[in-house]
Swiss-Prot record:
It catalyses: glycolate + NAD(+) = glyoxylate + NADH + H(+). NADP(+) binds at residues 159-162, 181-183, 240-242, 290-292. It is found in: Cytoplasm. The gene is gyaR. It comes from Aeropyrum pernix (strain ATCC 700893 / DSM 11879 / JCM 9820 / NBRC 100138 / K1). The lineage of its organism: Archaea, Thermoproteota, Thermoprotei, Desulfurococcales, Desulfurococcaceae. This is Glyoxylate reductase. Its main location: cytoplasm. The active site is at residues 242, 271, 290. GO terms for molecular function: glyoxylate reductase (NADH) activity; glyoxylate reductase (NADPH) activity; hydroxypyruvate reductase [NAD(P)H] activity; NAD binding.
Length: 335
């Protein structure tokens, strides 16, 4: 029996490829940049399975032109780059890698919070680029003043796995925790003393606003001009969720006009971020290249989970992290 063919859209950990090779003929796109759409389309036409990343556009046009394709295994929690509804209609399974990046993303969120609150990147540049040397100030009582976190209010927008872990760390810093989410989290309220707020009140009260929402039609540009104007002038906005949750133009205006004090961003509406983008001009903005999950431990777990989803499918089993559960009614798993 001919083995199914999987196209892996980027170099991943060899352990994952080794596992895949036991069940699939594996082809890997070995360039650092993602495959161009036309290349991806060409590969999909010949593939039984795709191993994808958020940077790959898996739209209905591509799915419709891939007659052999049975499963798309995404190495990410999010899957807004995939037309899941179309995939389900065509009997194509879609999987993701939930849960494994909670710790890494929460830790990185706190790295951003601390960097923005204590002006760490500014301080590094101040020393590295010679400004401290030129000023000959030594220690100065008014130099690089930031803000303490103890006693401040941490607002969590999206109290899922990551948001709740960020809140837990915030509690250890002695912060007051408030949150807005689709549903009340009674257990977290009890454990952390967290208080539920409407979105408007969350924005008004937060000293640090940390965003942990998936991107949907409802959350796209959820934070725009009117929302940013509700925030404190001393507030810091942190986004490790999805870039398009925040209207970038509105955020630039808010920073330029002083509606908020600072921002720390790991995700953007357009990635990679153009080095000439207005956001890069602000000293009070910390920028990172969508790196919140970038620890060796987490990325290996993600790579293996995506591979394990593909292996389960090849064995005729429903993959453990199936996104579109209703697809089972359209087609049974396996090749």
């Amino acid at each position: 029996m001919k083995r199914p063919r999987v196209f892996v859209t980027r170099e991943v950990f060899p352990e994952a490829l080794e596992l895949l090779s036991k069940y699939y003929d594996v082809e890997v796109w070995d360039k650092y940049q993602p495959p161009p759409y036309e290349t991806l389309l060409s590969k999909a036409r010949e593939a039984d399975a795709l191993y994808t990343l958020l940077t790959d556009r898996i739209d209905c046009d591509l799915l419709s032109q891939a007659p052999r394709l049975r499963i798309v295994a995404q190495m990410a929690v999010g899957f807004d780059n995939i037309d899941v509804e179309c995939a389900t209609r065509l009997g194509i399974y879609v999987t993701n890698t939930p849960g494994v990046l909670t710790e890494a993303t929460a830790e990185f969120t706190w790295a951003l919070i601390l960097a923005a609150a204590r002006r760490v990147v500014e301080a590094d540049h101040f020393v590295r680029w010679g400004e401290w040397w030129r000023l000959r100030t030594g220690w100065h009582p008014m130099m690089m003043l930031g803000v303490e976190l103890r006693g401040k209010t941490l607002g969590i927008l999206g109290m899922g796995r990551i948001g709740s872990r960020v809140a837990e760390i915030g509690k250890a810093f002695g912060m007051r925790i408030i949150y807005h989410s689709r549903s009340r989290k009674r257990e977290i309220e009890k454990e952390l003393g967290a208080e539920y707020r409407s979105l408007e009140d969350l924005l008004r009260e937060s000293d640090i606003l940390s965003i942990h929402l998936p991107l949907t039609d409802e959350t796209r540009h959820l934070i725009g001009e009117s929302e940013l104007k509700l925030m404190k002038k001393t507030a810091i906005l942190v986004n490790t969720g999805r870039g398009a949750i925040v209207d970038t133009g509105a955020l630039v205006k808010a920073l330029r006009e002083g509606w908020i004090a600072a921002a720390a961003l790991d995700v953007f509406e357009e990635e990679p971020l153009n080095p000439n983008h207005p956001l890069t001009a602000f000293k009070n903005v910390v920028l990172a290249p969508h790196a919140a999950s970038a620890t060796r431990e987490t990325r290996l777990r993600m790579a293996m989970m995506a591979a394990e989803n593909l292996v389960a499918f090849a064995q005729g089993k429903v993959p453990p992290n199936l996104v579109n559960r209703e697809v089972v009614k359209v087609r049974q798993p396996g090749f």
